[in-house]
């Protein structure tokens, strides 16, 4: 069998960064007791998803995205296309993810153990309640949506969406500093969050690192959903040049109206 070069596409590269984030979370934990190593389910995806942000940054692509034969760096034009494509179809993708997370909750909050029509339940959950359209086959159907019954994510698929809020806000700390490789912030992320495992509530750890509650704006910007707030009314005022005013001679308004009628 002829040997061939094994390459990674962009999605596989993001997955590599994602799983490396999980690995770092495990390697950096410095808790005294093994029982304090685990974190809440809706916090576990933060370390992995935040790593994905670096995968497509031009500064990072210059370091690893090299042509496998010539070793040439990726052209800047291609880097920009990759960046712009990140917002493609994000509205529908987010709708699908939210529908999947909510339908996961639907099936795990049933108050009856009696058998029921799964297909009818699915149609209600995805189409009637969540607004998906039947012309597009749903990505997450119950028969093969393994997260809802296998792998520890039952009633927890929302972890991924909540982690997007956290990871985009956490990455904003690096981005807004002007250096996505800011060592000071990276050390704080490791010391205040990654290394502490589950010794405190996840949001306590997050606030300790970020100094604030997570903000949804970075996620909305990343997806292309953000709309700049309307300026205050005073800022819309335009200063017009002075106009010479001529006073109209006093007259009886009824007389003026009558004259206007006569001209018609």
Language model segments and positions:
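A positional/structural detector of protein chain ends, strongest at the extreme C-terminus
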Residues: 262-264
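Cation-handling catalytic/transport regions enriched in His/Asp/Glu
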Residues: 1-258
């Amino acid at each position: 069998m002829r040997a061939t070069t094994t390459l990674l596409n962009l999605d596989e590269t993001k997955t590599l960064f994602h799983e490396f984030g999980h690995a770092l979370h495990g390697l950096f934990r410095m808790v005294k007791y093994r029982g304090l190593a685990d974190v809440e389910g809706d916090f576990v995806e933060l370390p992995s998803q935040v790593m994905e942000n670096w995968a497509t940054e031009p500064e990072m692509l210059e370091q690893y995205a090299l042509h496998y034969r010539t070793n040439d760096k990726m052209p800047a034009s291609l880097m920009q296309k990759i960046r712009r494509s990140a917002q493609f179809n994000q509205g529908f993708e987010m709708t699908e993810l939210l529908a999947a997370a909510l339908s996961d909750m639907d099936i795990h909050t049933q108050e009856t153990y009696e058998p029921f029509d799964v297909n009818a339940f699915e149609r209600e959950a995805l189409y009637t309640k969540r607004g998906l359209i039947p012309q597009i086959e749903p990505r997450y159907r119950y028969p093969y949506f393994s997260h809802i019954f296998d792998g520890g994510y039952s009633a927890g698929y929302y972890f991924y969406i909540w982690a997007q809020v956290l990871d985009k806000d956490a990455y904003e700390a690096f981005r807004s500093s002007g250096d996505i490789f800011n060592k000071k912030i990276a050390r704080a992320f490791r010391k205040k969050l990654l290394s502490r495992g589950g010794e405190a509530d996840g949001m306590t750890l997050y606030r300790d690192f970020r100094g604030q509650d997570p903000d949804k704006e970075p996620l909305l910007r990343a997806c292309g959903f953000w709309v700049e707030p309307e300026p205050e009314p005073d800022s819309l005022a335009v200063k017009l040049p002075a106009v010479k005013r001529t006073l109209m001679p006093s007259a009886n308004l009824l007389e003026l109206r009558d004259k206007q009628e006569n001209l018609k």
